[in-house]
C-alpha cells in the first residue's frame, strides 16, 4: 500500500487487530522510506441501499458523509472516535438489515438522531436543530425541553 506521507510504494504491516465485534480489521503500517506510521481499516464490501434525497435525486450511500455529520455535531464534545465508529456501524447494520434497495435520506437522519441522543445530548440538539429546520425558537425550546426529561 502506498504511504500517504511520501507516496512510497512499499509499506509493512506492523500490527493487526480485529475489532471487538469482528466487523473490521485495523492495521498499523510503517513506510519503508520515511518510517512514518499510519492506520488502515479493512471491511467487507457490502451493497448499501441507494439514498433518495429530498429533491428526489438518488445517490450512493457514503459512509464518509455520515462520519462528517457525526463529527460536526460532536465537535468539541467528549465522545471518542471509537464511540462514533460504533454508532455508524449500528446505523449501517440497520440499513443492511432493512433489505431494501432504496432508503430515504430522512430515515438515515432519524437513525443519526437516535444514535446522537444516546451519545451526547448537546450533539443531538445541534444535529436536530439543523436537520429539523426549525421555524422559530419555540420549536427549538420544545426540543431542548424534551432532551432535559
UniProtKB/Swiss-Prot annotation:
Q: Where are the zinc fingers (unnamed)?
A: 3-34
Keyword Transmembrane helix on entry: no
Q: How is the cofactor bound?
A: Binds 1 zinc ion.
Query: What keyword terms does UniProt attach to this protein?
Result: ATP-binding, DNA-binding, Metal-binding, Nucleotide-binding, Repressor, Transcription, Transcription regulation, Zinc, Zinc-finger
Recorded GO molecular functions are: ATP binding; DNA binding; zinc ion binding
Q: Per the database record, which ranges form the ATP-cone domain?
A: 49-139
Q: What processes does the entry annotate via GO biological process terms?
A: negative regulation of DNA-templated transcription
Essential cofactor(s)? Zn(2+)
- Pfam families the record matches: ATP-cone, Zn_ribbon_NrdR
Lineage, top-rank taxon, reads: Bacteria
What is this protein's function? Answer: Negatively regulates transcription of bacterial ribonucleotide reductase nrd genes and operons by binding to NrdR-boxes.
Into which family does the record put it? Belongs to the NrdR family.
NCBIfam families found in the cross-reference section: transcriptional regulator NrdR
This protein's name: Transcriptional repressor NrdR
Q: What gene codes for this chain?
A: nrdR
Amino acid at each position: 500500500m502506498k504511504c500517504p506521507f511520501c507516496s512510497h510504494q512499499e509499506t509493512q504491516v506492523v500490527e493487526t487487530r480485529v475489532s471487538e465485534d469482528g466487523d473490521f480489521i485495523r492495521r498499523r503500517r510503517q513506510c519503508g522510506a520515511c518510517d512514518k506510521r499510519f492506520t488502515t481499516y479493512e471491511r467487507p464490501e457490502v451493497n448499501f441501499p441507494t439514498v433518495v434525497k429530498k429533491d428526489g435525486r438518488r445517490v450512493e450511500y457514503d459512509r464518509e458523509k455520515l462520519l462528517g455529520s457525526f463529527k460536526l455535531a460532536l465537535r468539541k464534545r467528549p465522545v471518542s472516535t471509537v464511540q462514533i465508529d460504533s454508532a455508524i456501524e449500528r446505523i449501517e447494520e440497520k440499513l443492511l438489515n432493512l433489505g431494501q434497495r432504496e432508503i430515504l435520506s430522512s430515515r438515515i437522519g432519524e437513525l443519526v438522531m437516535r444514535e446522537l441522543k444516546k451519545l451526547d445530548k448537546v450533539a443531538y440538539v445541534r444535529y436536530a436543530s439543523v436537520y429539523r429546520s426549525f421555524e422559530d425558537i419555540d420549536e427549538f425550546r420544545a426540543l431542548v425541553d424534551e432532551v432535559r426529561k
